[in-house]
Amino acid sequence: MTHWIAGEWVQGQGEEFVSLSPYNQEVIWRGNGATAEQVDQAVAAARAAFVEWKKRPFAEREAIVLAFAEKVKENSEKIAEVIAKETGKPIWETRTEAAAMAGKIAISIRAYHDRTGEATREAAGNQIVLRHRPLGVMAVFGPYNFPGHLPNGHIVPALLAGNTVVFKPSEQTPWTGELAMKLWEEAGLPKGVINLVQGAKETGIALADAKGIDGILFTGSANTGHILHRQFAGQPGKMLALEMGGNNPMVISDNYGDLDATVYTIIQSAFISAGQRCTCARRLYVPFGEKGDALITKLVEATKNIRMDQPFAEPAPFMGPQISVAAAKFILDAQANLQSLGGESLIEAKAGEAAFVSPGIIDVTNIAELPDEEYFGPLLQVVRYEGLDKAVELANDTRFGLSAGLVSTDDQEWEYFVDHIRAGIVNRNRQLTGASGDAPFGGPGASGNLRPSAYYAADYCAYPMASMEGQETELPATLSPGVTL
């Protein structure tokens, strides 16, 4: 069974689609997508469940969420294995994701109390009480790169606030979405509070268009997010929160400190998860001169030694394949385009079996106008520069604004960087990936519009209600002109 609607597992009535393991192209999941009619049924079930769910005391909603967290802990190895098979990420990495699925629930609970509680103040003789109320039915769109952890960062805050959910996983990771839904079922979630619909583009469009949806929490590519944004232009009554990608700059100062530590930080920033994290470094700014030359030489040498293999291989690999053969081709095509524009490959990314692509580094200093695209994979562009102010100017030349970083031991350089860079997440002397659930996650421009993840998701799962409360109705000393009593 593919879909969970109104507390029942049902078969999809749309077109068949499959999940292919990206490291060997074996079919590991098969099902039929949800039709528009089935999506409407899921939304109706969520709407019906919302009536009672929002009335439940917070303690009851919290208890069910905590029961789910326990189920995740009990099944953490199974979750890690499923994610590894669907995404191709090394098992050591997917184990950290399984742990985060349960671990960040505590952040969401704390956020509910911190950001959606009641507050009272006096003003002009009135008592002003700020309360928070759930929006209603939330559509949650999950990405393929973190198919367990990231959707959870939307679903849990939505439920805690009293909303109900229709969840659509990525069509490339349906097995993970199905497994998570089964754990919610085992945790005792009432019927209709979460509904799972699977499918590709048609299912997603139907969900975004559904009249019973009050808000969308989306994590995914900029292209898909912008389609949703245009789709919402005629639906002002819906809340839309987008978390999208970035063309993230990483600036290396002449004062970068330890060479090996700097190279390791770059590799972790650019090639972790085979470059398939939205915060990965895409552009590396390296100063002209001997220190910059030494850095690039060491980086190229270390990158050649990166172990790439299947997720369960021994010894353990650092990175696996791209999510699909099409995604692998996209990276190779991007590299070819940069080469045609004048880029010089320091290491050429090469296709392997199935969806594997080896990491590539390309010097694009001589390209006058770099394509402002998110190359979601292991392709790092190097730009040589002179002067930190020039590096920051080049780094800001993008429509995105998610993540940025500076490697420097100089405090004044850091102050200049953090004051002038345009990014929502800024890092000093650490990898660009691996943001904290306690911090806002997102950025300006094409990287998104809100910060609906983990701690700050509470802001978008409930609306503030301000009530001005007087002790009794009072007649003013002076009536408004034209009124006689």
Curated annotation (Swiss-Prot):
GO biological process: one example: arginine catabolic process to glutamate
NAD recorded as keyword: yes
Principal EC category: oxidoreductase
Keyword Oxidoreductase recorded: yes
Reactions it catalyzes: N-succinyl-L-glutamate 5-semialdehyde + NAD(+) + H2O = N-succinyl-L-glutamate + NADH + 2 H(+)
Protein EC: 1.2.1.71
UniProt xrefs under PROSITE patterns: ALDEHYDE_DEHYDR_CYS (PS00070), ALDEHYDE_DEHYDR_GLU (PS00687)
Coiled coil: none
Active site: E243, C278
Keyword entries, A-Z: Arginine metabolism, NAD, Oxidoreductase
Residues that bind NAD(+): G220, S221, A222, N223, T224, G225
Pathway(s) per entry: Amino-acid degradation; L-arginine degradation via AST pathway; L-glutamate and succinate from L-arginine: step 4/5
A Pfam family matched in the record: Aldedh
GO molecular function: succinylglutamate-semialdehyde dehydrogenase activity
Job description of the protein: Catalyzes the NAD-dependent reduction of succinylglutamate semialdehyde into succinylglutamate.
UniProt family annotation: Belongs to the aldehyde dehydrogenase family. AstD subfamily.
HAMAP family per the UniProt record, alphabetical: Aldedh_AstD
Protein name as it appears in the record: N-succinylglutamate 5-semialdehyde dehydrogenase
Origin species: Vibrio parahaemolyticus serotype O3:K6 (strain RIMD 2210633)
Gene: astD
